[in-house]
A protein has these predicted regions:
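Conserved cytosolic headpiece of P-type ATPases
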Residues: 1-256
Length: 256
């Protein structure tokens, strides 16, 4: 989907900071747990991440200064199965892990939310996703007993017992030519299918907007696909027009 049906030009459309969360920590999480680099030619990196840096700068932040002040000691890189990324820093004397990723994954690892707060956050995610926005969640964790240097070693267990910070919603507009391309495929008897790592609600909104999903069509997530037998998948194949939250192995199975 990204860059083929959409422009791959992400922009931050909205933010939500948990009222009890320090605003500066939310901002730091968005730009420190981030692999964007800045050159004379502009931003280099994944558009989802460069949009966070652009927003931070637009809001008055100094990206180079903040990266120099709070260097990254260690990281747990993003992968499509875990759907999280974490980085480790010394924030004014405090050893802090920042984590960003998919809300549905990150929310289950947080410990500082009431049931009402969880419901409100999930409702906001539903609202943004239904508008075709990509939602990123951010959290932090104070770490005890880990050396504050590049000799620090992180493992996946650190991505538990997190403190939720907030959400950012990004828009990746559809390419103008996508609408006609999808229509032309249908006129030629070709059934277009969208395959994406995005949340199912977000992807469905975009798929409907550009004409890929029609009445009666089905959207399936990667985990749902994993639970399907081959016969079950073949039986639903003609109705499935969207595969969301897919992993690389899911994509191989779909193509086969």
């Amino acid at each position: 989907k990204t860059g083929t049906l959409t422009q791959n030009k992400m922009t931050v459309e909205d933010t939500y900071i948990l009222p009890s969360a320090p605003e500066n920590m939310f901002k730091l999480a968005s730009v420190l747990c981030n692999d964007t680099t800045v050159t004379d030619e502009g931003f280099l990196g994944d558009p989802t991440e460069t949009a966070l840096v652009e927003y931070y700068i637009k809001e008055g932040g100094n990206y180079d200064e903040i990266r120099t002040k709070y260097p990254r000691f260690a990281e747990i890189p993003f992968d499509s199965n875990r759907k999280l990324m974490s980085t480790y820093h010394d924030i004014d004397g405090e050893a802090v892990l920042f984590t960003k990723g998919a809300l549905d994954v990150l929310l289950s690892r947080t410990i500082n939310l009431s049931e009402d707060e969880r419901k409100a956050i999930e409702a906001l995610n539903q609202k943004w996703s239904s508008q075709g926005l990509r939602v990123l969640a951010f959290a932090k964790k104070r770490i005890e007993g880990l050396v504050k240097s590049t000799e620090a070693v992180l493992d996946l267990s650190y991505e538990n017992d997190l403190e939720f910070l907030g959400l950012m919603a990004e828009m990746d507009p559809p390419r103008e030519e996508s609408f006609e391309a999808v229509a032309e495929c249908r006129r030629a008897g070709i059934k277009p299918i969208m395959i994406t790592g995005d949340h199912k609600i977000t992807a469905s909104a975009i798929a409907k907007r550009i004409g890929i999903m029609e009445d009666g069509d089905i959207a399936v997530t990667g985990p749902e696909l994993d639970e399907m037998s081959q016969d079950e998948l073949m039986g639903k194949l003609e109705k499935i027009s969207l595969y969301a939250r897919v992993s690389p192995s899911n994509k191989i199975r779909i193509v086969k």
